[in-house]
């Protein structure tokens, strides 16, 4: 039949009785004509429509058939076209029922009472499948559709376009020749020799390509002898696959799997390319195994041309009451050292019962040079200590108990550290017990230490202490006061040493401490600042007084198991003890005064400015020192501390601090950190750090500055850099330069890093990474290096060509 288009303003004639129609070959019953006529008006041709065995209707009757179509409401015209609409909402398919079919076209012809031929903008929809073409033949008995000319098949979020296609529509079975295809979930496209539709989820593509680039600018594509796609499992498998980058093959694999969505899937991750002065060309191609929702494994095959083949693995797991991670690397027969190189790291936590937990943290490397030779970051390469620890913790109400063994692997040239074999620790913490805060800590530890590199044995022994603390916080609007009492009782049992056989082996100490912390907060409007910045500001003034008293106890013969001098700063100046650990308790008769002022946005509560100044006065002088006793201490004031943090302007951040000695008129410590971040991926960081050499810092002076940043060079290219310089040594500490380029479907990164290593030499490395959007999305080591070295760094991402809701609208 031939459809005659109606003007939008022309109404359908009243339909006569259909039984009077005839054809050249026989009568076509109304039950057969009705679905075909209604289909042209936008109604469904349901599978339940009953056609008799009459012949094809008479072509001469076409006009009368169209004119007798039932009247249906017309949608508003669009550019003069009639837009068909359903007179009633389509009925929902019940479970077990076959879904109805919907057909439309410029010309529609029925045959064999159960078939239909559509020509011109032909379209068939059934269930979730859509078949289109210049000409489309559909047989309801076999549910077969054949599209010829500009055939389009849409199903399961995928669209295929080719010269012809044949489909069993409800079963989603069929094929298409020479298709172009598009995947909605990933934005990927490709071409093929043939595509076979197995069912609604699976398809097989022969001689296929795949890319997430725009079809007109495919910088990279993946070609394969065969692609097996499974939308239910959301994974694709390629056989005989080759990855092309700017038409150059760069990688291949006999079998290759890749995700069809952003969900976690097994497959290759971003390859990592690098070059090291000692390792040569360095290539890593990680492979990710999605074993289960709660377990995964990543293998890191790594080839270093100057050393050999290295294999690394990272296994993670989590379950009901337990979790853990195992990382390991092995390099058999390193060509540089003629030895096997390896490392491992294992962490595990286990819930044994309610409140009872066990843990393991084991880390080790094969030799002292492993971090310098085989790690990829400055932090890893300078690590000289690896912990091995296992323990059990128990928590019940206000009680906490810890039992652990802690050992270390210390690499040369660093000296060994004390190990806990074992430690038993218990704490009781109770807040607001009749207004009091109560804490009691008891500890037993046996300290052991390996021989030094020269064979010297340092002191070893056992330490037991009990330290109860009680405070009474008084907090009122605008002010607070907290008196506190601490009592420390410590007992040492030392092991005899061959080099000092007559030395005393038993020590004990009981030391009380009293402190009183108090402060006030005054608040007012800041009209001047409000006028300048156009924002309502509040200003605070917060004075603070802190007094501490501890009597002197001679501790010059006590060992130093876990105690060091705290760096002088705000944390130390308002504390009861200037030492960390429990081997030293300083004698105190000190008063600290501090003053803080803040500017706060009244509407948002954001702190835009904070300035603090503080100083401590020692009334009697401190005799207890980290390495002995000062015989004649003098009273006096400490260094003056001042610090400020400023964020008054959007995108600007300033943090500065200074430690000034009024007596010597020297600056003993200062730091400055400035950051400018006007937009995402636009940042500039400037830092400076200075420390004068003192006995507390082991005569180690610091005078360093650094600058780092990230900035767009073009719309798609970004530069990243860092430079740190030591003025005392008059040499570079470390430097980094990198370039990132974001295309529509890939991101390229090249990073060069040079840093001073532990042997006073320099290590230089180059990293190169290409990340293909939709094929490999997990970043690798260059991202970690950039995040560690450039504060605020944001990795660039691919910038796909924008699409609209009208693209691939099927």
Swiss-Prot record:
It is found in: Cell outer membrane. The keyword Membrane applies. GO terms for biological process: Gram-negative-bacterium-type cell outer membrane assembly; lipopolysaccharide transport. The keyword 4Fe-4S does not apply. Its main location: membrane. Together with LptE, is involved in the assembly of lipopolysaccharide (LPS) at the surface of the outer membrane. Component of the lipopolysaccharide transport and assembly complex. Interacts with LptE and LptA. PANTHER family: LPS-ASSEMBLY PROTEIN, LPS-ASSEMBLY PROTEIN LPTD. This is LPS-assembly protein LptD.
